[in-house]
Every structure is written in structure tokens, then in C-alpha cells.
Amino acid sequence: MTAVTDRQKLQYIAARAADARVNVELETEGMTLNIGPQHPATHGTLRIVARLDGEQVIAAEPIAGYMHRGYEKIAEVRTYAQVTTLVNRIDWLGSFANEVPFILAAERLMEVEAPPRATWIRTLLFEMSRIANLILFLGDMGVQLGAITPVFFAFRDREYVLDQIERVTGGRFHPNFDRIGGLKDDLPKGWLEDTKRVMDKVRTFCDEIEDLLMGSEVFQERTRGIGVIPPDVAVQYGLSGANARASGIDWDLRRDACVGLAYPEVDWKVWTHPDGDSFARFWVRLQEVREATRIIDQLADGVPSGPVMAKVPRIIKVPAGEAWISTENPLGEMGYYVVSQGDLTPFRLKIRSASFNNVSITPWLLRGVYVPDIVTILASLYFILGDIDR
């Protein structure tokens, strides 16, 4: 009898509430969430200060500078050969690619051209640096979303690429191999054949990643439609590289503004995606790793014979002048503006790196997203803090 009475009471209360159309509005108190500066999703010492309304981001502010090293100022008291040891440490995952545009700018001022063999080897090592960089992105993207297996595959196959780079340059992460007028050394015997075998392993890795991540329903749900960047916004924020191409912008400096490298001599494709979301950014970089293996195979088959160093003075004094060179680096456009007054050292060095723009868009991109999607978006933008804190 008691149970029936209780049920009747509940029905009566519910009816009264419905009749009175009682609306209960819940108010939430905003909070501030600090992501970083020590956080695996920020690839270094980046801090994101996010203001939340419940689980939703209402504002986000990126704060960099915790690792600033002052490379542009230090370069003013270093010789041109010594500057390459600095720029190696900007994007430390693709070090050789950082050297090339600086050396090309110095060569333009000196009116020196590297021999064809050196140009082809430069391009080959440039693409190997791209693979070494992007392989880690492909594995790390899975880790940020809770899938740890892909990163083990990434480290496994990245070692093969780094071993080949080390055989030529002597350095795995900081080669310091490029020189004004060419390269420090020639290729060791059998290196090209071994490199082509490594490219077969990299292609297998790409297939594994595609199966593990892109074939996962969870990965698709966590990335599709998340962090969409329209083409006009990408242009406004100066995005470049894969981030721009993932928003449908068909622009690649290797094809559209190639200087001093052998890309026009080989057959390759620029990949774009129309969606502009986190999935598109992952997909474009996966295709770029595959395309890099094609480029390397063609370069390995066609490297011309001859010297790897032009005749330049032992002590380099770059003539007075100004030069700007930018290249399509793994993270996007990397450019150097070199000003010389005819001394042993640059008078001024301005570095344009891609990661600063990649991070600059986060206040616009994170507004309105939910907390779990913050890490997805940061991982898909892909930046290295050494590329920002120079």
C-alpha cells in the first residue's frame, strides 16, 4: 500500500511541475585549464591557457618562449659554417632540411652554384629528413588519441631512416653536413641501394598505419570534422605545408618555387584534401611520406656522377647584400633572410618557421571545441617548439 502511495505522490508532483511549466536553469562557473608547458601533446614547452564553460572551450591562449635560445642574435657572431650547427636545432626532427635554405641563401649572395651531384644528394637527404620527421607524427597522432601501438612501429622504422642519414653525415639528429658550394662528403659505397631497401620498409609502415588508425572507427570519430580550418582562414593565418594542403590549398614550394634542389627532375604529386579537419591533416602527411619514398627512389636511380663540392675559398666571406630563400620543410615553409655586410658572419639573420603560424591559429581553432578535442587538434596541427622558440 505504501508503494502505491509513494507512486501517487510522485505522479502528483510531476503533474504539478508540468502544469506550472517549471524550468530549472543550471549555471556553470567558468574555470581555467592549463595544458603544458610540460605536456606530451605540445611537442615541447608550449602552454595553452584554456578558459572553459563546462567541457567547452570559450577562449584559448598559446604561450611560448619557455625555450627561447636567441639563435637569430647568436648568428651575428658566428661564421656561416657555424650557423648551420644552430639551424640544425630548430626543427630537431628534420635537421638537415633546416640547413638547406640557409646554405642556398648564402650561395645566392656568393653567386656560387653547387655541382649537380651535390644538388641531387641534398634533395635526397632533404626528403629523408621529411620522412624521419613525419613518421614520428604519424605514430604520435595515435598516442594522443589513446592508441599506443603505432608509435612503436614509428620508432622502429624511423631508425632505419636515421641509420642511413648517419652513414652519410655522421649525425643522426644534427648532421651539419651542408656546405656553401656543396656537401661535406660524398656518399659511401652501397648507400643508395640500401636506401631504396629502407624505402620499401617505410612504405610497409605507411600501410600498417593506414590499417591501424585510418581503419579504426574510433580514430575516424575523433578526427573527422574536428578542428576544421577553411581555406581562407588558413591563408589569413599564414599556414603552409600539409596544414594548408589539408584545407584544399594546392601550394607546395618544391613544385611552385623550387630553388637549388632537384625536384623538377623527378616525377611526384602534391597531395591535397578538401575537408580541412584533423583527419585531413593526418591523411595528407601520410600521403607525403609515401610520395617522399617515390622521390627518393627516383633520385637514387638518377644521381649524376661528379664532385660534391664547388671551388670556394676556405675562409668564407659572403659579399654584401641581402637574400631570401624558403623551402618546403616537413613542418611547412622554412625561410631565411640573410643580410651580409661582407664579413665572416651574417649582419642579420631572420628565420621564418612554420610552427609559429601553426600555433598562432589555436585561439581561433580551439574556441567552441570540447576538452577531449584539444589534444586531437594540437596533435594534428603538428609543431615543434624548437621551431618557435629559436
Stretch-by-stretch model annotation:
Residues 2-47, 51-348, 352-390:
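Active-site bordering "gate/hinge" segments
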